[in-house]
Structure formats: structure tokens, C-alpha cells
């Protein structure tokens, strides 16, 4: 029972952080593009496209984070098939978007962006159904003072730091790539 109390508190705090972080990025998307892809900012078409792509696809990060959380719960219950199958949903969604939706868009890349977002919702929906079937769907509460949360944060901080260094490197690559001419070898 204690582990489920922790999972519910973790789910609540995780949802809160994901929601507010996603909301902030969506609201400041042009600033976000200026910081992380400055080369796009001074080309009106590229800037508008980048802002639109960010606003359409950024929620996918929150959705896939919840899918990863669900996968962890399922793995602890010896259920490995669905977490392994989940990326296939993403691929199928993008293929369908590219083949069937792209021709109906003036700028076909929008179809792929919407395909990414739809894939995230489908992945999460399938995971929610699977967790309900095994009676392990967390019921998020917002108990930020749960003793397990502080212990969890202390244990996960080194992993976040290590992963963050890799992400910073990728962001720097993106900044430099955005400054190159279209079609430049990278």
C-alpha cells in the first residue's frame, strides 16, 4: 500500500511539473525559438514554421513522459510487451500522416507534426487502458510532502544531471545548425 501511495504522489507531482513546463513553453514559443534556434528567428517563414512545430509537437514530450512512467509501472509487474510495442504506434502514426494527411496540407510537414501529437495521445491511451486492466493506474494526488518524493529526487538527481549534459550538447548543436544556410552539410 505504501508503494501505491508513493506512486500516486509521484504521478501528481509529475503531472504538475509536465503541465506547467509544457504550458510555459507553449506560451513563450517564439522566445524559445529565439534562444534555441536563433538562425530561424530572422527568417520569417522559418521562425513561424518553427514556432508552429514547437507548439504542435511539444506536448508530445509530456505525453511520452507519462508513457515512460506507465512503462516503468508495467515493467515492475513483469509486463514488457506493451512498453516494447509502444514505439510502433509512433511509427505507424507518422506513416499514416505522411501518406494520407500530408497531401491535404499546404505545408506538408504540418501533417507530420500532427501525426507526432496523435501518436502521443494514442500511446498514452493504450498505456492507461493496460494499467487499468491490471488495476495499477495511479490516482494522482498532489502530496508534495510525501517522504518518498524527496528520497526519489535525491536518487534521481545524478541521472538528471548526466542526461542534462547530453541534452545541453544537443541544444548547442541545434543552435549552430540553425545558423547554417538551408541545404548546408551538417
Where are these regions (language model features)?
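Membrane-embedded alpha-helical bundles of multi-pass transporters/translocases
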Residues: 1-186
Amino acid at each position: 500500500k505504501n508503494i501505491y501511495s508513493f506512486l500516486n504522489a509521484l504521478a501528481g507531482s509529475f503531472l504538475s511539473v509536465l503541465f506547467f513546463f509544457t504550458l510555459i513553453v507553449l506560451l513563450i514559443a517564439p522566445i524559445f525559438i529565439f534562444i534555441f534556434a536563433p538562425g530561424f528567428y530572422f527568417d520569417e517563414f522559418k521562425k513561424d514554421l518553427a514556432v508552429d512545430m514547437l507548439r504542435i509537437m511539444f506536448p508530445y514530450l509530456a505525453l511520452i513522459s507519462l508513457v515512460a512512467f506507465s512503462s516503468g509501472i508495467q515493467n515492475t509487474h513483469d509486463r514488457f510487451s506493451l512498453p516494447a510495442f509502444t514505439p510502433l504506434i509512433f511509427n505507424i502514426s507518422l506513416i499514416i500522416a505522411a501518406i494520407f494527411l500530408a497531401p491535404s496540407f499546404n505545408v506538408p510537414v504540418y501533417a507530420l507534426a500532427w501525426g507526432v501529437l496523435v501518436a502521443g495521445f494514442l500511446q498514452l491511451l493504450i498505456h492507461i487502458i493496460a494499467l487499468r486492466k491490471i488495476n495499477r493506474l495511479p490516482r494522482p494526488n498532489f502530496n508534495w510532502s510525501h517522504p518518498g518524493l524527496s528520497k526519489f529526487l535525491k536518487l534521481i538527481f545524478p541521472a538528471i544531471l548526466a542526461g542534462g549534459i547530453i541534452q545541453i550538447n544537443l541544444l548547442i548543436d541545434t543552435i549552430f545548425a540553425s545558423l547554417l544556410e538551408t541545404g548546408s552539410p551538417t
